[in-house]
């Protein structure tokens, strides 16, 4: 509950929180105007991780720009690659093979689990519970191993491509993902046993950081922050992309718009992600994993060894890239943190003229001020954790 009772002798002062504080989940500097232990105003200072990503992309070919998206929200990298790939595909008007679409959806949902396990585990750690962190990192390790087997990297995957994915699934990976899907719901249940009905956890999260429906709309919230306030908006349902329209899953929404509701939604989303992954595995056909258009997709290694034309095409695609037709497009995906969007403007050359990135955490951090007012200093840590912010995407 927000603390409103004030002492006659309370003294107002300013408190600097961060940017080196572990509970700020990155390089966040907060200037808090305090009245004793009560927060009257919270002023976030951002930009400490600014690297000029949008400008750097303008100097790269479309293929060379993909790794920059892994380094935005580095907790859920593949979802951001997905948005950039969709934007390029809209301009190219290229068809993505069915198998590639299911692989993309499957890894997007694995990424969602990767994100939510970290968020819940670190939020629990911030309020004093160590066990969830140890348990969930064990599960995250398995997903990172799937990342490594499919892309060669545990974190910055660089796996999605305009027109499909970089390479097919290695032998035995599907079976391992099936095994993971069978045992992971039990791990979520164990996590719920620790937290959901825990008296201390509820005291730290119930009625903390309340966001009303109107506030969520006014501040441009998306994802869990929006659904926690009772608004059933999920891009996978409302504006389906790839194969989401053919998959059966539910959208979890909250009632009270507090930290506890948002925790429950993240738990339910992990259950739904497992459901989606299982359907992807069942429906995934045998076939190509990227478009066969030679002007976009490099030839196979076997073709390069036989054909000089294939070798030349391969060299040109990796050295010069391909020209994307002039035009502009906005493509968005339902990333774990909210709506991640890419506005792409092409002038018909092999490099983007402008690439504007919409990061969900940017809007959510703006709302920290009204969410924090009237709460104690210790509640600020819980509110920052429930925002699920990563400064790679906020500062860009």
UniProtKB/Swiss-Prot annotation:
Keywords: Cell inner membrane, Cell membrane, Membrane, NAD, Quinone, Translocase, Transport, Ubiquinone
A Pfam short name: Complex1_49kDa
PROSITE patterns named among the record's database cross-references: COMPLEX1_49K
Location in the cell: Cell inner membrane
E.C. number(s) listed in UniProt: 7.1.1.-
Gene3D superfamilies xref list: Cytochrome-c3 Hydrogenase, chain B
Annotated catalysed reactions: a quinone + NADH + 5 H(+)(in) = a quinol + NAD(+) + 4 H(+)(out)
Membrane topology of the entry: Peripheral membrane protein
InterPro entries, per the entry: NADH_Q_OxRdtase_suD, NADH_UbQ_OxRdtase_49kDa_CS, NDH1_su_D/H, NiFe-Hase_large
MF terms in GO: NAD binding; NADH:ubiquinone reductase (non-electrogenic) activity; quinone binding
GO cellular component: plasma membrane
Subunit note: NDH-1 is composed of 14 different subunits. Subunits NuoB, C, D, E, F, and G constitute the peripheral sector of the complex.
Function comment: NDH-1 shuttles electrons from NADH, via FMN and iron-sulfur (Fe-S) centers, to quinones in the respiratory chain. The immediate electron acceptor for the enzyme in this species is believed to be ubiquinone. Couples the redox reaction to proton translocation (for every two electrons transferred, four hydrogen ions are translocated across the cytoplasmic membrane), and thus conserves the redox energy in a proton gradient.
Family: Belongs to the complex I 49 kDa subunit family.
Stated name of the protein: NADH-quinone oxidoreductase subunit D
Organism listed in the record: Orientia tsutsugamushi (strain Boryong) (Rickettsia tsutsugamushi)
Gene expressing this chain: nuoD
């Amino acid at each position: 509950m927000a603390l409103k009772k004030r002492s006659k002798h309370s003294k107002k002062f300013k408190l600097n929180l961060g940017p080196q504080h572990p509970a700020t989940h990155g390089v966040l500097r907060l200037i808090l105007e305090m009245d004793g232990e009560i927060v009257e105003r919270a002023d976030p200072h951002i930009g400490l991780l600014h690297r000029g990503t949008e400008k750097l992309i303008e100097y790269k070919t479309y293929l060379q720009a993909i790794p920059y998206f892994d380094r935005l929200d580095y907790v859920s990298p593949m979802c951001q690659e997905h948005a950039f790939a969709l934007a390029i595909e809209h301009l190219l008007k290229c068809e993505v093979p069915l198998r590639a679409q299911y692989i993309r959806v499957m890894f997007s949902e694995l990424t969602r689990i990767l994100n939510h396990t970290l968020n819940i585990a670190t939020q629990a750690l911030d309020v004093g519970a160590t066990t969830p962190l140890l348990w969930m990192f064990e599960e995250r390790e398995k997903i990172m191993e799937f990342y490594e087997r499919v892309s060669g990297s545990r974190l910055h995957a660089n796996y999605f491509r305009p027109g499909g994915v970089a390479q097919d699934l290695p032998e035995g990976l599907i079976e391992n993902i099936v095994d993971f899907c069978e045992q992971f719901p039990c791990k979520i249940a164990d996590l719920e046993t620790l937290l959901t009905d825990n008296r201390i956890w509820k005291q730290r999260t119930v009625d903390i950081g309340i966001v009303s429906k109107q506030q969520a709309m006014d501040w441009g919230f998306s994802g869990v922050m929006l659904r926690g306030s009772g608004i059933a908006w999920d891009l996978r349902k409302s504006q389906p992309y790839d194969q989401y329209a053919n998959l059966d899953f539910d959208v979890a929404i909250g009632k009270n718009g507090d930290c506890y509701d948002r925790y429950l939604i993240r738990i339910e989303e992990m259950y739904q992600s497992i459901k989606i992954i299982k359907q992807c595995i069942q429906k995934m056909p045998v076939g190509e994993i990227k478009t066969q258009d030679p002007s976009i997709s490099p030839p196979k290694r076997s073709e390069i060894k036989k054909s000089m034309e294939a070798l030349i095409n391969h060299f040109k695609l990796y050295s010069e890239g391909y020209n994307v037709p002039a035009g502009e497009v906005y493509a968005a995906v339902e990333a774990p943190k909210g709506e991640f969007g890419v506005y792409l403007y092409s002038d018909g050359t092999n490099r983007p003229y402008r690439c504007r990135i919409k990061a969900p955490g940017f809007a959510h951090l703006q709302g920290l001020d009204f969410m924090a007012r009237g709460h104690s200093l210790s509640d600020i840590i819980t509110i920052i954790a429930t925002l699920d912010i990563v400064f790679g995407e906020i500062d860009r």
